[in-house]
Amino acid sequence: MKMNKNLLFIFFLFLSTGLFGQALPVTPIAAGQSKFLGCAWSNGQNLNFQSYWNQLTPENGSKWASVEGTREKMNWASMDAAYALAKKHGMIFKQHPLIWGAQQPSWIGALDTTSQRKEIEEWFSQLAARYKDMEYIDVVNEPLHNAPNGMLPWGATNKNVDYAKALGGAGETGWDWVITSFHMARKYFPNSKLILNEYSVINSTETTKKYIEIIKLLQADGLIDGIGEQAHAFTTKGTSATLLKANLDLLAATGLPIYLTEVDIDGLKDDVQLTEMRRVFPIFWNHPAVQGITFWGFRVGLWRNTEGAYLVTQAGVERPALKWLRAFVNDTIVNSQSVTVSSTDGSTVVDKLGSTLAMTATVLPVNTTIPNVTWTVSPSNLATIDSKGILTAVAVGTVKVTATSWDGTGRKGTMDVVISNSTTATSEKPLADLITVYPNPAINGNFTINGIERIKQIELFDQVGKKVIAFNHLNQSTLNVQVNVAPGIYVIHFFDGEQFSYKKIIIR
């Protein structure tokens, strides 16, 4: 079979860009904003990267071990690709990192300090010669938690390589090796903004103060241009907004700009991730000292994949947290104003245990940023309902189905559903055949119900499942009803203690 070449090209174009999943944004999320919103880059995170982010940090390709795993054999391929992508699309580029206690070449530990210093200088100089326009550089990464000084990092089984001695070791300040690293960085990268980067700082005031001690040493020599806090999910989750902001304030008191450098928001369930994004991200973005935020991956396959930190699904669909993020950054959030619940087939009755009824929620306005809802049913011993709104009858009775908006407004919609079980009928004649309703149509809401000797409960519902009136503990054969309602079609539910039945009535 032959296929038109143009059609084939269009097919593969759509496939390669992910447009089968969802239309791509025209510009990066933070385009035109006073602070950047970026992401870690790797081959696995490359697809449509420039459509979302205006800042790029190579996740692993710019680390010393990735570039010079074998001594004197430089592999620049990954960093070249990252740098080229950033420059092509006008994205801010940040080198990550120069000095760290992890992911440095394994061979560095076997050298004497003189040779180590020579190799460090060579690493700096070759970077500077090859990449002349790096806006930001993480000079030292994780000095408190993962230093190249022979320490045993938290959770590790082996001590780090000690090449800090080649940079002066602890020295008089306790942090001479950090200061030397920044002096070297200022020498080789005079036009780049130099950053000190660390994790799990802002969840602890004690750690924040220790971090500031190093920062002030660097400030004294005019060596540091910004403060990096990774702000991974394991730092922010469980830490109050008050404490996060208070520690950001302490860092800001140094007078330096702050960069949240490796942010991720966990959540295998969309509503969980959205809730945490709405809680954490505004603390960062709205802080006057924060000048940029970098997510540590956004696609499936990122480093916290099992925790669900990705913002775009495998199918290329943006998760609600990402949709909210874009709207928040651009101040275009539209909150829900109403939620209406109905069944997809218009029914308000499930007449057999184990049967299902598909529910739907209409969220208005139609352009609500987050139109998703959470489904619940009460009492829960009578029915269950799943995340897609499929109600399953468990026991006879009346349940209230509720749809609650995810957008934080608390908007809810409800509908009552009657559950009966035709197999429990005790009369040879169907319950509905024993009951008469007249006149039908009813004028001005006046009508009479006969044949209700066995009936214990009568309820009147409108077409969207809203209960209008109810009569309980009945012990009579006739009931005269008068209701003040709008003209329309209504449903009368009858319950005899074992089964439900219903009749429609027109009220004029």
Predicted regions and their residues:
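Glycoside hydrolase catalytic-domain groove-lining segments
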Residues: 77-89, 171-197, 204-271, 281-285, ...
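Aromatic-rich peripheral "rim/lid" segments of glycoside hydrolase catalytic domains that contact
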Residues: 68, 126, 142-171, 184, ...
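C-terminal outer-membrane/trafficking sorting elements
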Residues: 367, 372-374, 381, 387, ...
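Substrate-binding cleft and catalytic face of glycoside hydrolase catalytic domains
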Residues: 51-69, 77-201, 250, 267
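Bacterial Sec-dependent N-terminal signal peptides
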Residues: 1-23
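Acidic-and-aromatic substrate-binding clefts and catalytic sites of carbohydrate-active enzymes
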Residues: 37-48, 64-77, 104, 144-147, ...
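Boundary/entry segment of secreted carbohydrate-active catalytic domains
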Residues: 22-59
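Extracytoplasmic soluble-region selector
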Residues: 333-426
